[in-house]
Structure formats: structure tokens, C-alpha cells
Amino acid sequence: MGKVIGIDLGTTNSCVAVMDGKNAKVIENSEGMRTTPSIVAVTDDGERLVGQPAKRQAVTNPERTFFAVKRLIGRRYDDPMVEKDKKLVPYKIVKASNGDAWVEADGQTYSPSQVSAFILQKMKETAEAHLGQKVDQAVITVPAYFNDAQRQATKDAGKIAGLEVLRIINEPTAAALAYGLDKTKTGTIAVYDLGGGTFDISILEIGDGVFEVKSTNGDTFLGGEDFDMRLVGYLADEFQKEQGINLRNDKLALQRLKEAAEKAKIELSSTTQTEINLPFITADQTGPKHLTMKLTRAKFEALVDDLIQKTVEPCRKALKDAGVTAGEIGEVVLVGGMSRMPKVQEVVKQLFGKEPHKGVNPDEVVAIGAAIQAGVLQGDVKDVLLLDVTPLSLGIETLGGVFTRIIDRNTTIPTKKSQVFSTAEDNQNAVTIRVFQGEREMAADNKMLGQFDLMGIPPAPRGMPQIEVTFDIDANGIVNVSAKDKATGKEQQIRIQASGGLSEADIEKMVKDAEANAEADKKRREAVTAKNEADGLVHSTEKALAEHGSKVAETERRAIEDAVSDLKEALKGDDAEAIKAKTQTLAQASMKLGEAMYKQQAEADAKKDAAKDDVVDAEFTEVDDDKNNKKSA
């Protein structure tokens, strides 16, 4: 069995880790970084860039650079959060045929699962390069507060990337695994996870290798991206006041503002003031305009204070659901890049009444936890038991549009529960089961996961037929629902696929596209390698011709020059095979030049040796001062 990797698929950055003996190890990517920006771009010539290369060109290609796509995963186009996102991002968010929110570049649409798959592919390649073997199984993390549609969409992303997703695990739970694996003490901990796009709080009990989640809460649309955009808005407003130009209408300027905001936010975690300097941000008839502004930590904290306060209520709810007080929490573990912000740490300290634990790397701890869970599933990590929970209540719509819960939130998973319902009308021969997830009392106010029909119920007065509805949640938090007529034994079941979501055919097509693109990327890489080798050979041959061309026969020199011209012509195209063939021809032709150079060198060396042979050894006398005796050579 090959290695199972652990992947933290983040909103802003992603990270991959693997078990190395008894410890989990974070793997560096091809750029030498331990985290990879969760950014995908499509260039003018259709090339796809992932990670740092995509981030580097974002300013000049804002409409085709997709970032923070995790916030769209498993969401409908008409979701209020998608409406909010559409106003904030420079790329186009469109409505897919299934009603989901997708992204578009140059008329080509991509599902958020597909974009996430490109990032997962990069993680997979990073692990394969490090391990020197194929990797096709992974544990992938998701925010604890992700609903069923978002979990299913993440699993689909893994499949498109060519990975069998053995387990979807919650990010705070993964962080707790990484924090508590080598600790002997038992107790209750809180994991406060404020990342790039989502916020989670989980309360866990740890002891003797058992990690039991007592409760979880959060907000799947609150994170570093919101802090960045708040600062972008402030900078744009200040610039408009000063210069009378609205930068929000300029996508290129907006992307530069976003990069500057992210940089300033990071700097203000370790310094009390920073300067934002963006020369030539825009221009009008009077000439170019520059943005220069000093920003203090206090000002930034005031701008984002309400965002930080938004994390407080979910923490209180999680404590209440777990049946513990803040004083009973032994340790608060900080996770996610935003938890580095001093103001965030101050709010956490006030809330829990203790200094938060800063002993874990907030950017890497989730991937490490995922790798540990991968080790558990592989049998490499022993005596660890993970008991997670479902974050939201599950149930069905009953008479009057009421939401009837069948599984309450914070129920340990995997779990299975049944409840018996009946018909609402006389002689009703079919019932429609509408499945919802959420905490509101009316079904319509919750997230609809899907629906199915149970047909062929025998005619009977209303209230007589007995229909047993069973909910089954697996260890990934993914839901199966079945309905059975107890009189006839007829059963109907669905694995919940959101009314949107990707069908098997969609996933299969995307898998094929990913494979085809991997082949195209490989060819493109081969062409670049071939071009580099060819360039090097042309340069060295031309240099050698200039210095030693007179030492070879005229016909041979002409053959070398012709081969150089042919190779230069081939270098204008992208045909790797043609470049390799012409490189080989030039290498063969230039061998004569090499022979002439070596022959000349050999003759020069021979002359030196001959000169040495003509040297006569001289006689010398060594005088010993003490004894005044003589030695002869």
C-alpha cells in the first residue's frame, strides 16, 4: 500500500504533510515553500498556473486569476454569501446549469471543485516528488462548520485530482490531533481556528489517545479575506477623498490594493505601523497618481473590530453546547494565519480568561493533523481514536413546513437514527421526503440537501401508513437517507447530492480534463527543458566557433553553422521533438569542433611535457651548520 498524504486545502494557502516514521512532516513544494497559495490562473495562451506562479501574475491578469474559491464550494449561485463575493472579486462568478456558483475565464467555466482539484493536484505532485512514488490516497481537511454539500464538493475535488479521499476531517479536529498526539495530560481544550476564509471553534476532550469532539461552531464566510477586503475598501476610500478617483472601477488597481492590504495586515502583526506605497496606481489627464499612506496597528484594529467580534458568539455557543464554562478549558489552541493578529489573541484571552497556546505553527498544524489521521487509517499510528461530530442538525420537512430534527447537531459520527412518519392525506400513495440541514425551526430557513419520493404506498386513511425515515452519517460527515414503507417493505434511498452538486458524469469529465491537462502540462514542461538545453548548446557552439572555427575544415564549419541555424529556427516553435532532433544534429556536427579543440590542447600539453624532459637535474649540496658535513644529491 502506498503512502496516504494529509492535505489542508485552505482558502488562502494549502499545505501537504506525510507520516515520516512516528512524526508527521510538512513537504516543501517545487518553489521551496512549505505552504502553497490556493490560487489558480489561466494565461493568455491557455496555460494553467497554480500556487506561487499564479499569485505572481495576479496583478496583470486579475480577471483570470481565481483565489479564495473555497468560499464558493458547494454553494448555490443565489446564496447571499455568493452575492457578497461577486462584489469583492475581480474574476467572474456565473450561474452553472445546475444552479451552483461557478467561475469563468475566456468563456470557459470551472466548478469550484475543479479549481480546488488543480490545487490538490499540485499538493499531490509535491508529495510524489518528495516520496519518489505515486500517491493516490489522501485525507483532506474541511472547516468544521461545512455542510453536507460543501463536504461532498470537497470529496469531488479530490476525485477530479486523481485522489481517493479516504477521509474528510474537520480542521480544528486535525489541529487538536497534531497538538495532543505526544501529550500525556488529559483535559478539555478549545481550538480557535481563524483562517483565510472560514472560522471554526471546537471544544474537545483529550485523554489516553482519544480525541472526542464535544461541540463545534463557526462561520464559513469569515476569515483573512474579509480583513483584506476591509482594508482595500479603506484604502480606496482614502484615495478617492484625496485624488477624486474611484479605484474600485479599475480591476488591475484593485488587485494591487489587495496585495498591498495583505502585506500590510501581515506586517502589522509584528510592528505598530507600516507604510503602503503603490506608485503609478492610476492616472488622469494631469498625469500618473501614486498611493502612499501610513497605517497604524490601532487604525487597522478599529477597521476590523466587528469582524473579530463576530468570532465571540460562536465560541459562547460551542461552550454552551459542550456543557462547559470558559474556566474549565485547559488550553486554547490558536490555528489559522489570522490568529497571529495581536488583537485576535487579546479577544481570545478575554473570552477564555487565559493566554492562548502559541506552540503550534498555525499554517501547518492542520496538514500535520491530516497526516496523523492518514497514519491512523494506514495502521502506522496506533492507539489514537478520533470521535468527531456533525456540525449542524439534520431532519426533514413535515406538515406545515416545520423542520423536524432526526439527528441533532454535535452528535458523534458515524451515526444512524430512524423516526417513523405517516401520510398527511387519505389514500396518499406517495410521499416526498425533503432533507434539510440547519438550526432554524422552519424547513425553508435551513439548507435543503435534496429530496426523493417513496412511491407505491397502499391506499389507507391518513395517519395509518408507517414510513420509517433513516439518516445515516458516515465518518466524513456525508449523509445517506432512506425511507421505508413498513407495510410493503418498499424502500427508497439517496446518497445526498445537493440539488446542485456535480453528477458522476460531470466528475468523470473533469477527471478526464485534468488528466488531459496534466499531459499538456508535461509536454509544455518537456518543451521548456528541451529549449533550455538547445539554448545552452547554441550559445556554447557559437562561442567555440568564434574561438576555434579556423581549426576545422571549411565543410565541417559550414555544417556546424547550418545546424545552429536549423536549431534556432526550431526554437521559434514549441515542438519539443523537433527541438530535440535539431539539438542532436548540432551536437553531432559540433563534435568535430570539440575534437579539434582537444587535439590542440593535447599538442600543447605534449610540448610542455617535452620541455620538462629536456630539464637536467642540478647537483646540490646541503650544509649542516652543526656538524658541517655535506650530503650530495
Swiss-Prot record:
Keywords carried by this UniProt record: ATP-binding, Chaperone, Nucleotide-binding, Phosphoprotein, Stress response
Leader sequence range is none
Q: Which residues carry this modification: Phosphothreonine?
A: T198
Function description: Acts as a chaperone.
* Up-regulation conditions: By stress conditions e.g. heat shock.
Q: What is the lineage of its organism?
A: Bacteria, Pseudomonadati, Pseudomonadota, Alphaproteobacteria, Hyphomicrobiales
Q: Which CDD domains match?
A: ASKHA_NBD_HSP70_HSPA9
Q: What's any one GO cellular component for it? A: cytoplasm
Can you say what this protein is called?
Chaperone protein DnaK
The record's listing under Gene3D superfamilies reads: 1.20.1270.10, 3.30.420.40, Actin, Chain A, domain 4, Substrate Binding Domain Of DNAk, Chain A, domain 1
Q: Looking at the Swiss-Prot or TrEMBL record, what is one Pfam family this protein matches?
A: HSP70
On whether S-adenosyl-L-methionine is a keyword of this UniProt record, the answer is: no
